[in-house]
From Swiss-Prot:
Belongs to the intron maturase 2 family. MatK subfamily. GO terms for biological process: mRNA processing; RNA splicing; tRNA processing. This is Maturase K. The keyword Heme does not apply. The lineage of its organism: Eukaryota, Viridiplantae, Streptophyta, Embryophyta, Tracheophyta. One of its GO terms (molecular function) is RNA binding. One of its GO terms (cellular component) is chloroplast. The gene is matK. It comes from the Eukaryota. Keywords: Chloroplast, mRNA processing, Plastid, RNA-binding, tRNA processing. Usually encoded in the trnK tRNA gene intron. Probably assists in splicing its own and other chloroplast group II introns. InterPro entries: Domain_X (IPR024937), Maturase_MatK (IPR002866), Maturase_MatK_N (IPR024942).
Length: 522
């Protein structure tokens, strides 16, 4: 990192540094190698075993990669020429056809393209002296806001952010931020060559898929740039369509490795909250008549207005993606529902508005009368069906919810198997602690517990009943008791037993910075 700072000091222009030469610096790939900068792991760890290398030889591989880039750099000026140069036709010498080298370049690219944004952010924070905002780190921080505001609104729109995105659109978006022409040419060339052999992210139409756990840092960055452009245009349309003048505009920027509060414009009614994509990208803004929130590829738009107004914004989104991003987007993918009659799925919860009526008899002197009171409550429930579908995709149960064994984990020790199942169960309990009714969550715990028992029985070639009798109390403690210890610190008198007591208590945590993987599958 010190070498990187020294490079920009020598460059003399911190706002528009020359980024392309960084591809030939070993410390860039060392930063990509650092797990602290990559929460989802790096290709320098487990994937090295696939190629027959260990972590000790990674430095030699980096040097070999840089040497080959030096040898081929004059071919990178034109994408069309890539099919004619000498290394495309030979699989043994073509590092672009080697998955390992392409992943190294992808991770290095992900570090480099973030540099201009990081430098602008750091300089902006020093100039404004903006304090950190710790409470906004949690994904759960959005739910108290929804509880307070949504009870007064009429309609909600479920929006799916369109993907995949054409790679050329992504490069054009970056041109507004990065003026290093050689780097942009190399990026365009790399994406085209990446498309030729990799089918994880880029389809046959030269488009990039982002909703995969194997997605690399570079593609997460490209997706965030695309979504930022979408929402920037949306905010622009919102400001020009409102008859009310915006008096303030604040942005709370959440990143995986640093989190800060930023003020952008001196323009009380618009707030934007966001964080890194894979840790649960979360945007929301408010005005007197509309609220918007997004988590990864799913967004909701709620309004006090009429159904006609919501249809207007629906076609605004459709036209935005069709004419600005050249993406054919069907209008039926945006659903408009009445909040009082329909529920919506967002952030792993099934949310709805419940209306409760109560009658009170009042008496004044000899006159008595009845007063009917109607109250509206924001309710969040555990989406049991969605979670069962997620568990079935992860091979913990069948589609109908029948627990099955996990054969891929049978090579682990007994304690390792129990610990993995218990950790998943605790994470789900932690994330869904804000549910008003937790009986559905107990069913999920039961599926995981029995799946754990079946996995152990499969490993030891025994029956499930034998292991339930042998480890029944231990499994119960691992899957249920430990998950309730956090709640006992807050509500010690309310919790008597995991299946009884405060199953209706709703608790929002301020330390959840990412969505559980199983929740995200739904």
């Amino acid at each position: 990192m010190e070498e990187l700072q020294g490079y920009f000091e020598k460059d003399g222009s911190r706002q528009q540094p020359f980024l392309y030469p960084l591809l030939f610096q070993e410390y860039i790939y060392a930063l990509a190698h650092d797990r602290s900068l990559n929460g989802n792991g790096s290709i320098f760890y487990e994937p090295l075993e696939i190629f027959g290398y260990d972590s000790k030889s990674s430095l030699a591989l980096v040097k070999r990669l840089i040497t080959r880039i030096y040898q081929q750099h004059f071919f990178l000026s034109s994408v069309n020429y890539s099919k004619q140069n000498r290394f495309v036709g030979h699989h043994h010498t073509n590092f672009f056809y080697s998955r390992f080298y392409s992943q190294m370049i992808s991770d290095g690219f992900g570090i480099i393209v973030e540099i201009p944004f990081s430098l602008q952010l750091v300089s902006y924070l020093k100039e404004k002296e903006i304090p950190k905002s710790h409470n906004l780190r949690s994904i759960h921080s959005i739910f108290p806001f929804l509880e307070d505001k949504l009870v007064h609104f009429n309609y909600v729109s479920d929006i799916l952010i369109p993907h995949p995105i054409h790679m050329e659109i992504l490069v054009q978006i970056l041109q507004c931020w990065i003026q290093d022409v050689p780097l942009l040419h190399f990026l365009r060339f790399f994406l085209h060559e990446y498309h030729n052999w990799n089918s994880f992210f880029i389809t046959q139409n030269n488009s990039i898929y982002l909703f995969s756990k194997e997605t690399k840092r570079l593609f997460r960055f490209l997706y965030n740039s695309y979504v930022y452009e979408c929402e920037f245009v949306f905010v622009f349309l919102r400001k020009h369509s409102s008859y009310l003048r915006f008096t303030s505009f604040r942005t709370f920027l959440e990143r995986r490795y640093f989190y800060v509060k930023m003020e952008h414009l001196q323009t009380e009614h618009l707030i934007i909250v966001c964080c890194d994509y894979f840790n649960g990208t979360l945007w929301s803004f408010k005005d007197p008549f509309m609220h918007y929130a997004r988590c990864q590829g799913k967004a909701i738009l709620v309004s006090k207005g009429t159904h006609l107004l919501m249809k207007k914004w629906k076609y605004n989104f459709v036209n935005l993606w069709q004419y600005y991003f050249y993406f054919w987007y069907q209008s039926y993918r945006i659903h408009i529902n009445q909040l009082s009659k329909h529920s919506f799925h967002f952030l792993g919860y099934l949310s709805s508005l419940l209306k409760n009526s109560s009658t009170v008899r009042n008496k004044i002197l000899d006159n008595s009368f009845l007063i009917d009171t109607l109250t509206t409550k924001f309710d969040t429930a555990v989406p049991v069906i969605f979670l069962i579908v997620s568990l079935s995709k992860a091979q913990f149960c069948t589609v109908s919810g029948h627990p099955i064994s996990k054969p891929i984990w049978t090579d682990l020790s007994d304690s390792g198997i129990i610990e993995r199942f218990g950790r998943i169960c605790r994470n789900l309990s932690h994330y869904h602690s804000g549910s008003s009714k937790k009986q559905g969550l107990y069913r999920i715990k039961y599926i995981l517990r029995l799946s754990c028992a079946r996995t152990l029985a499969r490993k030891h070639k025994s029956t499930v009943r034998t292991f339930l009798q042998k480890l029944g109390s231990r499994l119960l403690e691992e899957f249920f008791t430990e998950g309730e210890q956090d709640l006992s610190l807050i509500l010690p008198k309310a919790i008597l037993f995991p299946f009884q007591g405060s199953h209706r208590e709703r608790i929002w945590y301020l330390d959840i910075i990412r969505i559980n993987h199983l929740v995200n599958r739904s």
